[in-house]
Swiss-Prot record:
Amino-acid positions noted as binding Mg(2+) in the UniProt annotation, renumbered to this chain: 497, 499, 501
Catalytic activity: RNA(n) + a ribonucleoside 5'-triphosphate = RNA(n+1) + diphosphate
GO molecular function: DNA binding; DNA-directed RNA polymerase activity; magnesium ion binding; zinc ion binding
Keywords per UniProt: DNA-directed RNA polymerase, Magnesium, Metal-binding, Nucleotidyltransferase, Transcription, Transferase, Zinc
Name of the gene encoding the protein in the UniProt record: rpoC
Domain of life, source organism: Bacteria
InterPro entries referenced in this protein's UniProt entry, alphabetically: DNA-dir_RpoC_beta_prime, DNA-dir_RpoC_beta_prime_bact, RNA_pol_asu, RNA_pol_N, RNA_pol_Rpb1_1, RNA_pol_Rpb1_3, RNA_pol_Rpb1_3_sf, RNA_pol_Rpb1_4
Record-listed Zn(2+) 1 binding positions: 67, 69, 82, 85
Entry similarity comment: Belongs to the RNA polymerase beta' chain family.
Enzyme Commission no: 2.7.7.6
Official protein name in the record: DNA-directed RNA polymerase subunit beta'
Function: DNA-dependent RNA polymerase catalyzes the transcription of DNA into RNA using the four ribonucleoside triphosphates as substrates.
Cofactor: Mg(2+); Zn(2+)
Positions contributing to Zn(2+) 2 binding: 865, 940, 947, 950
Amino acid sequence: MAFAIGTSPIKRDFTRIKISVASPESILARSRGEVLKPETINYRTYKPERDGLMCEKIFGPTKDWECYCGKYKRVRYKGIICDRCGVEVTSKSVRRERMGHISLAVPVVHTWFFRSVPSKIGALLDLSTKELERIIYYEVFVVINPGEPGRKQGLKMMDRLTEEQYYQIITEYEDNQDLDDDDPDKFVAKMGGEAIKALLKRLDLDSTAKELRRILKESQSEQKKADALKRLKVVEAFRASYEPYSKEAKKKEEFSLEPPEPYRYEGNKPEYMVMEVIPVIPPELRPLVPLEGGRFATSDLNDLYRRVIIRNNRLKKLLDIRAPEVILRNEKRMLQEAVDALFDNSRKANAVKSGDSNRALKSLSDSLKGKQGRFRQNLLGKRVDYSGRSVIVVGPELRLHQCGLPKDMAIELFQPFVIRRLVERGYAKSVKSAKKLIDRKDPAIWDVLEKVIEGHPIMLNRAPTLHRLGIQAFQPVLVEGKALQLHPLVCTAFNADFDGDQMAVHIPLSQEAQMEAMMLMLSSHNLILPQSGKPVTVPSQDMVLGVYYLTKVRKGARGEGNIFANTEDVVIAYNEGEVDLHARIFVRYDKPRDEKNDVLSFIDAIPESKPEKRKWVKEQLEAKTLMATTVGRVLFSQVMPETISFINKVLDKKTAKDLIAHVISKVGTVRAEKFLDDVKGLGFNMAMRGGLSIGLSDAIVPETKKRYIKEAIKNSNKIIKEYNTGMLTENEKYNKIVDVWQNVTNIVSDESYQTLRKDRDGFNPLFMMLDSGARGSRNQARQLTGMRGLIARPQKSMSGQPGEIIENPIISNLREGLTVLEYFISTHGARKGLSDTSLKTADAGYLTRRLHDVAQDVIVTEDDCGTTMGIHIRRDEEEVAGKVKFHDKLRGRYVAHDVVDSITEQVVLKAGDLITDEIAEELRLNVGVTDVMIRSVLTCDSKRGICAKCYGTNLASGRQVDAGEAVGVIAAQSIGEPGTQLTLRTFHQGGAAQGGIAETEIRSQYEGQLEFENIQMVQSKTFNEDGAEEVHDIVIRKNGVMNIVDPSTGKILKRMIVPYGAKMNCKDGDMVQKGSLLYGVEPNSTPILAEKDGVIKFVDIEKGVTYKEESDQQTGHVQRVIINWRSRVRTVDIREPRIQLLTHHGELIASYPIPIKANLHSEDGATVHAGDVLAKVPRDLTRIGGDITAGLPRVTELFEARNPSDPAVVSEIDGIVTFGSQRRNNKEVKVKNAYDDERIYLVPIGKHILVNEGDEVRAGDPITDGSISPQDILRIQGPNAVQQYLVNEIQKVYQINAGVEINDKHLEVIVRQMLQKVQVEDSGDTHLMPGDLIDKTTFKDVNSKIQGKVRVSEKGDARNIQEGELYAKEEIGRLNRELRKNNRVLVTFEPAVPATSRPVLLGITSAALQTESFISAASFQETTKVLTDAAVEGKTDFLAGLKENVIVGKLIPAGTGLKRYRSLRISTANLQDSYEPSQRAYQEDEYAKKEDGEIAIDD
């Protein structure tokens, strides 16, 4: 695709790009001549052959300003065309842009339009791909005009004929062939490209479209409708490319009384899909490269072009000598195949292979597609000049904004700047001599270099660049050696360590680039992580350890109990060696301080022999004039900013992180930078002073371990005994044993931690490293000194869940050493971790790429979209483990509606207020505020991009987000980066299973009164271990709810769903305390219980048919398990295994369906009591630690909006459940509401039903088990519900599985993009098509355009209007008034019907491909399909997103590239109006569609 048309220069300031199907005329207009020979260069002279594929006459000279024969040399002959060789004297660079062409002997079908799915040509001609192929490859004839002979034979246009049939007609009606080709009576049938071209020429698109629309409206057959819709889409795409020549002319004609003149269209004609001329791309894009030894490496395209030319020339010769039809036909077919291979060689099974190596040649399509294609390799990712890379080492003495740049690198990178300075200062006379100075490494150059780099920032980048902090700017400092030096605090942002990592250096050259690097990218301006708003420059490892060591307390240290007048005295005393670093001392200090309550215990530091002193100190402490602290903390306070309170507690990593966040928000980045540098220095210094190192003796195994292990072995033996006697099933035994060991592991883990804590007064080096957060986790400490515990089995379990837990734990720890068997079991996890890492990194990277592509054009485009919508944030949701707190979700958002305190009924916040950190903190403490409606990206009404108010504050700065901020890209980075990080982190666990003791006792989190809803209970008697009888209330109704209510206000504090089978420990109306037991649950299985006393009857429970007896190999005990009988039984009489509960007289009380995998716990005919267990359904408990390996596929599943593999059946209405009859293998579940609206759901038998007969369900409640499909939520509860569901579910994976904090607004940005489209259901009177996916805003615009218009049903005596067309109501009214005056028949009309649509949830891949911009979509995936579709439609790309602009080489329309910033006018006349954005630019921005400067691309 080239842009130069004829000789006109390329327009550089274009604002949009249009793509269309190239007509033969446009190919010829771009061509500089016809390529006639297949030769490339002469083998003797190595000069291009004339008229060949490299011809200088066509493509331009190979040497600058020199013609082929050498008659004209030098630039003075510029533009002259040599009379001898015909070559234009010009720069050789034109060989990159000049095109040629090949005139084909017969028309050839373009493979893209024929092989695309659905086939464009097939859709227009209503032919299947098979049929088309037979015509195109010269197997059958197709009738183009039946003429007289055809009519006699009963042939119609488009009928296919074999060779025999064709020649039979030709011979039978010989005279007919003498008629003129245009004669309607002449019989014409052709094959190949000619036939297709002739058929396409005869197509009338308008009447085809009308006919297809008629079929859509009138046809009864669904299949016919679907086919018509498929064809109509292609027809309408072609029609869309036909723009009327001028809107004004059209308007003028519409109501004039003269007949309209015929329209002149400039659009894609269907026959353009068949080519008579093919373009030859410029030779520099398919070069011949000389290798040593006189051989040449050639681009594959040259081979492909050569085949086309050879076959074309041979065909021309054969036509000239009038060769037999058979030979001609074969040659034409070969030409078609050669052109197919040139355009797309990868689609065909028999692709053209290269001669020497057996690989397929790279065709034009292949050079666009994929990672190595033109888009991704050359346009989106370019190599950069002025860059270098080297290994990094730590630079502990650097300031935060500095980095160390090796001198040798610096002189190379800044060479042009240095040369200029050397010449200016007179060190060198010319550039050449300056270069020599540099090569000689003359001492003079170093001073010059120092001056040059002063104030010239450089950018450092570490691959993989997962988020924007992967590239930061620094002020370079020249260093000796060859390694870059990096500040230790920026390592977290780069995810760098110093084990051999390399980093790249880039130099911003222009003044603007340097400014942006200084202002926006300097490392000291990027202290906060954009993904969560938390600081990223946090001390780690040695620094944390140093600061932790510094602030620790040691009892009995030298100088403890001393009282100092001020902090300066403390420092002097320490320097003089009078007090130790960790001594507990008292200092007179009356400013604010941040301390824990344990400082009163410091009074012990004063000996008991001095009671007066003790008493006085205590009084002073209570009066807050004296402060109990340590020497180290005073030293730390010396580096603190003055306005921050004294930190009087031990600083571990978490406290340090919070402190840094506090400092940044209070004193700003400049002061914070100094503070961070000081903390770094102090940390390293103290880590050195402390001399911390760990030895073998520091890992202390707790004494109590043996006792706990003994106990656990006893318990597990007891469980095995119970299992042997048949009291437990295999599954229950497994789960119970796992629980026992999990408990012991946790206890031993705590014990070992406490042992370390007590050792040496908490100064055990291993403990300090763990406790400070410098290195290692509690889990690793457990493995070192406790016990390794249970290990996960890496392969999939029986139930298909990843990784079960091996029930024999590893009892040893790494300090004691493992036995051979234990070591072997351990290797499992370690190896799995390493293999996972390499596999999952690619997945996470691909997820990031899709996220970027879907969100790349979400930019902040306006200040306020004016919507009143928003989303609700409720307080009670925060109780779920790992969820973000209520006030954290509000921080940095704007309020949508007034916030009212439900207790005092006062307005706390007004609509439009920003919730700052302080306000969020107030809301957290104000219990009266339970529900806040905030503005959200999900409900933003901006036409393009989003508005600043809906987005809230920029997390990285804490201020309102600026116009032009590329929030979509930031969102994609924020979600993608942790995904990659987490997958890289799985193997640190070493496969040790953690977590997962199933919750068996549920306790109250609040104090209050209980209120039961829908809870039905029965009393059940059980016997405990001693044989004593116990009575329990057992819940026998699903979906029962227990509320904890504040008795004073009546407000519900907590709402909990009580599971079926729960053992209640409380009654309705009870007062409960915080922590009191509410109910117990069986964690490993769900029971099926008898509701009343009675007798049991088994129905359809037959041995070997619906259940099998599984005897355990070890115990021989038999379990009865319901099996999947549907797959085996084909007899009609089996319905479904169920247990009936009868009275003693045989009357039915209840019937319980028993699902597959359930274990029977009762006997046929036995008497049971209310609450007895009839059967148990085991839960698949595969409890394994937080490892995002399970999480990443879940995130992908949610972002791709895939339906889960085993979806739940969901109720669509509120109503009461009843069970219907059984059909085949399905059971009917009916839900009926108060308005007699009934829905029937068919549930496969054996799937566990969660509701009982008579239960009340709400719309959206699941009826069966399984995951709820997001599509169902969208259908039943609407877009808002599904948006919230997706955001919450993705957050769950990140927070609970991985402990990563991502702000909701990033997820909202992506989810918004997934719901941007609607699907047209009924097109009404618009030009839309049913089933079309279009943008919400476009859909609204289309409907608003036909408002106030009417559709003419009968035109009466009016002339210039069409029936069925739309016109403005006033115009028709005016026309009717005129007609009434003249007593003519009036126009009858009806109002225009708007289109209707439904919201669609698209996965991120399809959403990215559905983008408005074809350039962006083509560079993402399915390049050829996207380009084909766009070309047919004649699409225009307005270059609104980021990606399109990068591809065409313009500044991106975000950040400083926004139109409003680029058209600033700077003037100095009067300082007050020194700059003003032009008003026009502000309004129209980059997004206004401009009429001028369009570039056309032809396929």
